[in-house]
């Protein structure tokens, strides 16, 4: 019998809580990630008021320096810890796959100097459109359309760019290159990037609208991922008849593998929270696992190095946390975590190698405190033990600590 009939995992994308022990092996603009600290630096430089997460115990997580504006709680309502990544990457897919029990020992390919001509030429020949070569490098998704959107509107060329992540992204103005055409081009790009020397985690369609000086990316983004190289705990659950619900880009990250119910993409964090609440309210969802990704922290504020915007985004989530809890049942478990860091005060524009926080809450708890510090995959091991399925590759359950 399950200890919790339903478990709800919410990933606050990029909300790291301090440099990981191996941060010296990861870089931003040539600067090692050793001093990165997403939550710590936001709290220090922008001020951070998240009373609802603090009540669960966010401020109690062990750190060299306490979060400046997040108090510790003498009697928190939940259990907390921080988790370390073992996989060789700090990208979204690696983080989520490890959370679900995989150890990624061979990282995907990244292209710090842009994609080789062979790939670009193949995309041009397939699409019948030229590619803007000047955009072919690691680029902020908003900056690249600011810099080349006008040219694309005039010429119909494709904007192909990358980041420090193993991704190929194609941006296209919806009035110039229809979304369905963009999707077909991205599907082709996916087909030619499935093995080395260009093994990419994701191809991302990045549609946008607007006029020069006022371009906005739309919710028609679509990710073309590769399926995990072996079963994750999502597959174990689905195979055992335990329903799995994906909110936001979770379905894309796992390429649908192990997802029994895709609740759709998020237009924003707020929309994602709305969708999560609707999922919690589904009459047929009496037992199972929901998995939500809220990406605005990362996409809108981390990569843009905007600590004030990031702070406000955290405030928005914290303000709505009571709504999520109000729609949970007494025997539900809520787990709040992240997938990597993205310190908005740091060098460069890319992810940072950090610990991730873990907050656990249930109305059924009679205790509180610290969970032993562990690794990302401990989350999936806990979910697996609760529902009576095997773990994937790695992970140690902390279910017994939740009382």
UniProtKB/Swiss-Prot annotation:
Reactions it catalyzes: 2-deoxy-alpha-D-ribose 1-phosphate = 2-deoxy-D-ribose 5-phosphate; alpha-D-ribose 1-phosphate = D-ribose 5-phosphate
GO cellular component terms attached to this protein's record: cytosol
Pathway(s) this gene product operates in, as recorded in its UniProt entry: Carbohydrate degradation; 2-deoxy-D-ribose 1-phosphate degradation; D-glyceraldehyde 3-phosphate and acetaldehyde from 2-deoxy-alpha-D-ribose 1-phosphate: step 1/2
EC number: 5.4.2.7
Cofactor: Mn(2+)
Record: residues binding Mn(2+) 2: 298, 303, 351
Keywords: Cytoplasm, Isomerase, Manganese, Metal-binding
Coiled-coil annotated residue ranges, if any: none
Name of a matching Pfam family: Metalloenzyme
Localization per record: Cytoplasm
Binding note for cofactor: Binds 2 manganese ions.
Enzyme class: isomerase
Binding site for Mn(2+) 1: 13, 339-340
Alphabetized GO MF terms: magnesium ion binding; manganese ion binding; phosphopentomutase activity
A single BP term in Gene Ontology: metabolic compound salvage
InterPro entries: Alkaline_phosphatase_core_sf (IPR017850), DeoB (IPR010045), Metalloenzyme (IPR006124), Phosphopentomutase_DeoB_cap_sf (IPR024052)
Main location: cytoplasm
Biological role: Isomerase that catalyzes the conversion of deoxy-ribose 1-phosphate (dRib-1-P) and ribose 1-phosphate (Rib-1-P) to deoxy-ribose 5-phosphate (dRib-5-P) and ribose 5-phosphate (Rib-5-P), respectively.
Cited PANTHER family: PHOSPHOPENTOMUTASE
Family: Belongs to the phosphopentomutase family.
NCBIfam families listed in its UniProt record: deoB, PRK05362.1
Protein name, entry field: Phosphopentomutase
UniProt source species: Streptococcus pyogenes serotype M28 (strain MGAS6180)
